[in-house]
Amino acid sequence: MVLSEEARDLLADLPMHRRQTFELRLQQWGPDLLDAVTALYASPDEVASALVTIAARGFAARSDELHRLDERRLLQPDWFQRPNMFGYACYVDRYASTLKGMGDRLDHLTDLGVTYLHMMPLLKPRPGDNDGGYAVMDFSSVREDLGTNEDLAELATTLRSRGISSVVDLVLNHVAREHDWAVAARAGDAKYRDYFLIYPERDTPDRFERTLPEVFPDFAPGSFTEVDGEWVWTTFNEWQWDLNWANPAVLLEFAEIVVHLANLGIEVLRLDAIAFLWKRLGTNCQNQPEVHAVTQALRATCRLTAPATLFKAEAIVGPRDLMPYLGEGRHAGRVSDIAYHNSLMVHVWSMLASGSTDLARHALAGLPPTPPGGTWVTYVRCHDDIGWAIDDSDASARGVTGVGHRQFLADWYSGEFDGSWAEGLVFQHNKETGDRRISGTAAALTGLGPSRKDVAGGFARIFLAHAVVAAWGGIPVVWSGDEIGSPGDSDWASEDGHSADNRWVHRPRMTDSDRARRFEQGSDAQRVFDGIALIARVRAGLPMLHSEAPTRVLTDADIDDGLLVVQRRHPSGTFVGVFNVTGEHRPLARARLTDLGSGDPREVLSGHDLAEHGLDDPDGMLWVPPYAAWWIV
């Protein structure tokens, strides 16, 4: 590709080395950009030229400090894959009221070991109910109650000075109906009507809906909303209008938004609802091939302006559909850098409820490794409900049914199953499929909920769950409140706009007093916080937990069903994770550790002396304590 005249003019006043830098980037990423738009649009050269112009404008406006950040990241392309990466996710208003307040309350995070901070939707949403901030009416402005764009840029700079990368949501699939584009479309502006999917009659929506699943069957059934006698595509809620990504003007608009956020200093953009972007009749309109071409076009544009900014795909999809979001085939190394390991999260909860690792071993061992330049976000809880994404074929391969196991998990974590320690809430019961998702904090789902059904077990399960996800490589992310053992917000329904959405139970506000409780010896907050901080601290010193080292899940029949055993090989040595998901001692053959490369094994996480657990016993059997998490090197 060559620079357009307009792009040359935008770069003309820059120093020679800057102009040369942009031209070198165009040589590197220009072919990716052109390839992507060629797969999408009828006039690819025109679209590609417009994207390069957007990138050049952003490059010329980018600050010197951010240009230096770009150079540092290009010299350390694996910076986000290193074992010192440890994440935290929160709503700014619920953690610190404002962006300035966030900057004043970072000690809590640095003490935890955080190097990656995901601040939940903070761009201006519609007033009233807004899906937790995911119904955006202005992508160019921060929520007024949180602060200003300048406050966000200042916070991003402060975070960088403390070794923390900032992460912000970018909702790609839809906008609020109050967004200027939607307002203009509703007023009849032909240009903006083509930004959306609007049908004059019901026939086409009916044909689509034959194969479309419902996202919110309880309070937003269907995928279309009648507006002024026409039908608008609204996958999530009637006030969230799906965008028409087949229109290149939408791509250009979002390229401008990506560059704007990158120039505020945001280091990771979480691409929300990315799986839903492209619509195709006769499908579920998720995971369509064009989604990856759209991502590639946006990523290439961003790399021209701000290669320090990464993409994270929020694709909560089945395990077989997940890997393309990190890049496969023609898109390898060209789409998102990070994706959510939803399957790992689901199977952690499945193992704890069932006391069995059999299904998890089979499912997790069957996933291909991440591409060399990609990594996972691993997590125990997040802002959302838990959907029981148990693959039917995985379940049947292990002698159970997917429907039956999903039913069991919903029963267990809602507390309906006899003997359950959990106190979750059922979210979105789909009466047609029987699926029931679950809301609740980590504490509420492990025995430390309001009724404190199993205090000792709860502490052990919280530590174990976080130790598992932190041992998988990638970026483990802790959900706000879970690090202090919050049982949840008992008054979640009393806030305006929250009463119909029980996910707010696991989105509690955190006060300075709440944070201070971690200093009270023996408190829930102290015990949970210190445990998770220990995980982060030990992890940072283990090169075997670099993302490029693959995780091997052992599926051998001679390994006890209550133990999950994983191995990670790295030039610096071998890591073996041993996790007991039961409340009983479980045996592990000493020879297993030798076979896995641990000739002189040391447990470095929990402080367990393996000799006290049978390391040297004549029978050659180690006994792993209840809910133990062993990191062995």
Language-model segments: what does each one mean?
Residues M1-V633:
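Active-site and adjacent substrate-binding regions of carbohydrate-active enzymes
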